[in-house]
Amino acid sequence: MASIMKRGNTYSVRYNYKDHAGKPCKGWETFKTKAEAQERKITVEKELLDGTFLVPDTMTVEEMLYKWIPIQSSKHKWSPKTYTQSVAMVQNLIVPYIGKRKVQDLRTYDIEQFYATLSQTPCGQYVHGVKQELTENQKKWLLSSTSIHEVHTLLKTAFSYAVDWDLIHKSPTPREAPKINTE
C-alpha cells in the first residue's frame, strides 16, 4: 500500500498506483512533519482501496483550458465569435493570474482571491496575453462585474470537465458566482 520514510528533516510517503493506461507506477510526496505524512498515507491508502485515487498530474490551468476549449467549442458548435471571446478571456484574464498553477493544487479560496484580484484589474491590462503599459486615466477603468461573472462561468464549466477527466475530485470554483452590479 503506502509507506513512510524519513529523509533528512522531512518525511516521504511512498506508494504504488496504476496510471490512466493501467501501467504500474510509483509515487512519493514529501512532508515537513511525520503527522502530515501519516495523514497523507492514510488518505492515499483509502483512495487506492475505494478507487478514488487521483493520479498525480502536473497539468496547469492554462494547459487544461487550452485542451478544453476546442472540445467544448466543437461539442456545442460555438460560433467563431464565442470561440474568439473565450480564447481572449483565457489569454488575458485567466492565464496571467492563475494559468501556471497546477489544476490539482487549486482550491476554492484561490479562485475567490483571483476574482478579488480581477475586480481591481484595469480593463486592457493584458492584450493577447501580453501586459500593457496603461496611462493613469486607463488604470481607472476596472474590469466590470459582468466580465468577472463570465470568467466564473467559463471556469465553472471547464473545471466540471476536469472532474469528468479525473484530474480533480471536485471543482474549485465557488458555488456562488460573483454578483453582477446593475448600477
Task: Walk through the language-model features, giving the residues of each.
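Short, Arg/Lys-rich segments that mark the N-terminal edge of DNA/RNA- and chromatin-recognition modules
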Residues: M1-T30
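Conserved beta-strand positions that form and line the central face of beta-propeller blades
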Residues: S3, W28-T30, K102-D105, P172-R175
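Conserved tyrosine-mediated DNA breakage-rejoining catalytic core shared by Y-recombinases
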Residues: R7, S12-R14, R175-E183
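Basic, Lys/Arg-rich DNA-contacting stretches centered on the C-terminal catalytic core
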Residues: N16-P24, E136-K140, I180-E183
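DNA breakage-rejoining catalytic core of tyrosine-based enzymes
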Residues: G27, Q104, L167-K170, K179-E183
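N-terminal helical hairpins
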Residues: W28-T58, I71-H76, N92-L93
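Short amphipathic alpha-helical interaction/hinge segments
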Residues: L49-T52, P122, Y126, V163-K170
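Short, Lys/Arg-enriched alpha-helical recognition elements, typified by the DNA-recognition helix
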Residues: D57-V163, R175-A177
